[in-house]
Amino acid sequence: IEANNANAQEAIMLNQNGYITECTADNIFIVHNGKVKTPPAYVGILEGITRESVLQMCKELNIESEEVIIDVKDLLTAEEVFITGTGAEIVPIRQINNIQFNIGKTTQKLIEYFPEFVKKNSTPVFVKV
């Protein structure tokens, strides 16, 4: 409701403890001190395929990453924020409420590597029509 009232393109969901979980249709990541962080499954998220791909990409690119509790303060003080989803792929977040975020080097690196990662890790499927 708050996101609709603010004409936001996406809403960030909190669990009953006030921790960041995910967005309405995407997983969420923050970058803090160069480390990529995303909420763990036990806070109440759907473990998306693209989310898992980003965690694997971080390993391949030697980017530190972890699944960790993220609270609102962590989110609003992050250097970078991005969301992931099958259709969205990797999308940088530019603004939350009145706080602006830049598309940082880490997010940009992941966006640029994503097509190569998908090509390398996908299985071709052919359907005879």
Where are these regions (language model features)?
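Short, conserved active-site entrance elements at the starts or edges of catalytic domains
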Residues: I1-T21, M57, I63-E64
